[in-house]
Amino acid sequence: MLFRSSFLPEIFRSAGTKTSDAFFQSVLVSLINLVFTLFALWLVDKAGRKTLVLAGSSLQFVAFLLVGWFYHIHGSGLAVLILVMAFVAGHAFGNGVACWVIISEIYPTKVRGRGMSIAITALWVVGYLGNQLFPLMQKHLGSDGTFWCFSGGALLTIIFVAWLIPETKGRSLEEITKFWTEDKPATT
């Protein structure tokens, strides 16, 4: 999310928006982030953490795919704004809130401190790399290719979460520990 907010004015300008409008649109996107973050705080205990991450990542996948397509066909700046707002909404109620709750609940007590440290460090490293790579990706892949790559990242998130991350809503530490430590049959 760090790289997204850092480059919003440039994203909107490259979609054909005037500079003054690009900054206003950046503020509008930040308000969307606030509203959907507050919504997620209310929803996270009702819908479940995994459900929110999957729904949010799915919305991000579609939004990135379509932003890339609109850049590819030189579509309207308004469409890009709406799709960026959709991405931000998906991030806010998925990875922006539910991901942090999962990180705090998923590890057994014995490894919780180390596991959380590694997960949070990984999140910050990805944010840093996004900040560093975004301009290079735009230069070498174009805006369309850049957003298609991000859409691929969202798809990988969906697959990873769907197959490997358990739902932690309503589960005790003992249940989560048992999930990770019990013998499971190998699947073929």
Regions found by a protein language model. Name each.
Residues 1-188:
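Alpha-helical transmembrane bundle of multi-pass membrane proteins
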